[in-house]
Amino acid sequence: MAATILQGKEVAQSIRAELANEVVELKKQGVVPGLTVVIVGDDPASHSYVRGKAKGCEEVGISSEIIRKDADITEEELLVIIQQLNENPNVNGILVQLPLPAHISEHAVIEAIAPEKDVDGFHPISIGNMVLGNDTMLPCTPHGIIELIKRTGTQMAGKHAVVIGRSNIVGKPVSLLLQQENATVTMCHSRTQNLEEYTQKADILVVATGRAHMIGKEHVKPGAVVIDVGVNRIETGKLVGDVKFDEVKDVASFITPVPGGVGPMTITMLLKNTVAAAKKQAKQ
């Protein structure tokens, strides 16, 4: 039986419609959610992501600003900009687009953002709160993955979830969020031996390795929910995931396509975090 294709775009659209209604209500109370994105250098992929974020803001009624800086900006100059945004009451969310040039410490930049404006969910305080299960800004891609799984109607409690990849941006946080949904979680990575032994037992399989087509049908338990986070451009110029979509879709119960699966959810969760930040800051 062929899998149901989990179109992140459709789920994202329904969440954005809910957010747009929330923003209308906030504006009636004089609160206009505001997001500022800082981008350094001229990486085409980064500029494309930033345009997507600005478009998303416009769609739901969030006020957005993009601050573009040349790659030769100093770390000190960038930290001054962040401090000014921290102090600006019209800015509810601050996002510094990664990656940054080598001479700027990502760690220092992320730590400089006020935790209440950390809509990417990367600040150590946000991460600590997530580990403790406290109410906090969740990292956008992992949060989007959990929302996608929920929309399949899959009960995560008691299920075996396998996460391949242990990055700070996806692998580690999504494994934590799956645990908080009471799944039993196994984390695999580049050093894991006999990968199939783990993946074949997964009711939920999240693949975030950045290696094109590394997961085939032989890795997948029949009926599993497969979430493909990878985005890889192959020699033909085509974008593909970490999963061999055409063969795995015949084994899985649900599968995300690339592109159009997890990607649209990431920006939508950023918008959700910005609206949540605006609400919290309005109460303070």
Curated annotation (Swiss-Prot):
SUPFAM superfamilies: Aminoacid dehydrogenase-like, N-terminal domain, NAD(P)-binding Rossmann-fold domains
Catalyses which reaction(s): (6R)-5,10-methylene-5,6,7,8-tetrahydrofolate + NADP(+) = (6R)-5,10-methenyltetrahydrofolate + NADPH; (6R)-5,10-methenyltetrahydrofolate + H2O = (6R)-10-formyltetrahydrofolate + H(+)
E.C. numbers: 1.5.1.5, 3.5.4.9
Gene Ontology CC terms, in alphabetical order: cytosol
InterPro entries attached to this UniProt entry: Aminoacid_DH-like_N_sf (IPR046346), NAD(P)-bd_dom_sf (IPR036291), THF_DH/CycHdrlase (IPR000672), THF_DH/CycHdrlase_cat_dom (IPR020630), THF_DH/CycHdrlase_CS (IPR020867), THF_DH/CycHdrlase_NAD-bd_dom (IPR020631)
Keyword field contains Amino-acid biosynthesis: yes
Gene Ontology MF terms: methenyltetrahydrofolate cyclohydrolase activity; methylenetetrahydrofolate dehydrogenase (NADP+) activity
Keywords: Amino-acid biosynthesis, Histidine biosynthesis, Hydrolase, Methionine biosynthesis, Multifunctional enzyme, NADP, One-carbon metabolism, Oxidoreductase, Purine biosynthesis
Pathway: One-carbon metabolism; tetrahydrofolate interconversion
Biological process annotations from GO: L-histidine biosynthetic process; methionine biosynthetic process; purine nucleotide biosynthetic process; tetrahydrofolate interconversion
Residues involved in NADP(+) binding: G165, R166, S167, S190, V231
Keyword Lipid biosynthesis: no
Subunit structure, interactors included: Homodimer.
Family stated for the protein in its record: Belongs to the tetrahydrofolate dehydrogenase/cyclohydrolase family.
Record function comment: Catalyzes the oxidation of 5,10-methylenetetrahydrofolate to 5,10-methenyltetrahydrofolate and then the hydrolysis of 5,10-methenyltetrahydrofolate to 10-formyltetrahydrofolate.
Identification of the protein by name: Bifunctional protein FolD
Source organism per UniProt: Brevibacillus brevis (strain 47 / JCM 6285 / NBRC 100599)
Lineage, highest ranks first: Bacteria, Bacillati, Bacillota, Bacilli, Bacillales
